Curated annotation (Swiss-Prot):
NCBIfam families: ATPsyn_F1gamma, PRK05621.1-1. It comes from the Bacteria. This is ATP synthase gamma chain. HAMAP family: ATP_synth_gamma_bact. GO terms for molecular function: ATP binding; proton-transporting ATP synthase activity, rotational mechanism. GO terms for cellular component: plasma membrane; proton-transporting ATP synthase complex.
Length: 287
C-alpha cells in the first residue's frame, strides 16, 4: 500500500485538476449560452432562405440553374465543420465516423470524395487518414463571421461550377439541446426538392428582376453560404454543450476519485498508527 504522504499528494493533485475542470465547465456554460443566442439569431434567416429555395426547387422555372439539375455522380464534395479545440467528448469523432461511413458508401460505387475543412480537428484527422483535403480554415474563435468561411465555400462552389464535383454536402453537428448533439450530413447541391407538404401544395409565380440567371446565381450562392454559416454556429453551440458536459463528468469523477483516495489514506494512516502502537507495546514489554 502506498504511504500516507504519497496518497496526500495524489489527493492534492486530483483536487487541483478538479478546480480546473470546474472552471472549464463554467466557462463552457457561459459560451454555450452566447452560442445559442447566435444560433437562434441566424436560424430565421437560414430557415426562410431554405423555404424560398425549396419553392424554387419544386417550381417550374423558365431558367434552369445548374445548381438545380441532377448529374451523374463521379465526384462528391463535403464541407466538414469540426472544432478547433478538444475536450468536448465524442463530438468530433462521432461526426468523423458518420462521414467516413458515407464516404465509404460512395467509394464502393467508384465515386471520389473531396473535403473542405472548417476547424483544425477535422484537418488533422483527415490528413492523418489520407483524406483528400482541398481547402481549410481554422482558428475562427468563438464568434465566427461569414467572411471567414468564404474561402472553403468558394473553392467547393468553383469546383461544382467547373464540373469537378457533382454533389456537395455540409457535415456538422446539429444542436438539439444541452445533452444531445446529432452529427448530420445535408445535401447542398444540387438543390434537393423540398419534402415539406406545404411547399408542395403552394405554387408560387415568379417575377425576376433584373433577369432569372443573375438573380438565381446570387440567390443560390447566398443559400449555400447561409447553410454553411448556420452549420458552423450550430456546431459551435454543440461544442460548448459537449465540453460543459464532459467537464462536469470529469469534475464528478474527480470527486469520486478523491473519496476513494481518502479511504485509502485513512486505511494507510490507521495501519501506521497500529504499527507504532505495536512497537511501543513491544518495547515496553521488553523492558
Amino acid at each position: 500500500m502506498a504511504g500516507a504522504k504519497e496518497i496526500r499528494s495524489k489527493i492534492a493533485s486530483v483536487q487541483n485538476t478538479q478546480k480546473i475542470t470546474k472552471a472549464m465547465e463554467m466557462v463552457a456554460a457561459s459560451k454555450m449560452r452566447k452560442s445559442q443566442d447566435r444560433m437562434a439569431a441566424s436560424r430565421p434567416y437560414a430557415e426562410t432562405m431554405r423555404k424560398v429555395i425549396g419553392h424554387l426547387a419544386n417550381g417550374n422555372l423558365e431558367y434552369k440553374h445548374p445548381y438545380l439539375e441532377e448529374r451523374d455522380v463521379k465526384r462528391v464534395g463535403y464541407l466538414v465543420v469540426s472544432t478547433d479545440r478538444g475536450l468536448c467528448g465524442g463530438l468530433n469523432i462521432n461526426l468523423f465516423k458518420k462521414l467516413l461511413a458515407d464516404m465509404k458508401a460512395w467509394s464502393d460505387k467508384g465515386v471520389q470524395c473531396e473535403l473542405a475543412m472548417i476547424g483544425s480537428k477535422g484537418v488533422s484527422f483527415f490528413n492523418s487518414v489520407g483524406g483528400n483535403v482541398v481547402a481549410q480554415v481554422t482558428g475562427m474563435g468563438d464568434n465566427p463571421s461569414l467572411s471567414e468561411l468564404i474561402g472553403p465555400v468558394k473553392v467547393m462552389l468553383q469546383a461544382y461550377d467547373e464540373g469537378r464535383l457533382d454533389k456537395l454536402y455540409i457535415v456538422s453537428n446539429k444542436f438539439i439541446n444541452t445533452m444531445s448533439q446529432v452529427p448530420t450530413i445535408t445535401q447542398l447541391l444540387p438543390l434537393p426538392a423540398s419534402e415539406d407538404d406545404d411547399l408542395k401544395r403552394t405554387a408560387w409565380d415568379y417575377l425576376y428582376e433584373p433577369d432569372p440567371k443573375a438573380l438565381l446565381d446570387t440567390l443560390l450562392r447566398r443559400y449555400v453560404e447561409s447553410q454553411v454559416y448556420q452549420g458552423v454556429v450550430e456546431n459551435l453551440a454543440s461544442e460548448q454543450a459537449a465540453r460543459m458536459v464532459a467537464m462536469k463528468a470529469a469534475t464528478d469523477n474527480g470527486g469520486s476519485l478523491i473519496k476513494e483516495l481518502q479511504l485509502v489514506y485513512n486505511k494507510a494512516r490507521q495501519a501506521s498508527i497500529t504499527q507504532e502502537l505495536t512497537e511501543i507495546v513491544s518495547g515496553a514489554a521488553a523492558v
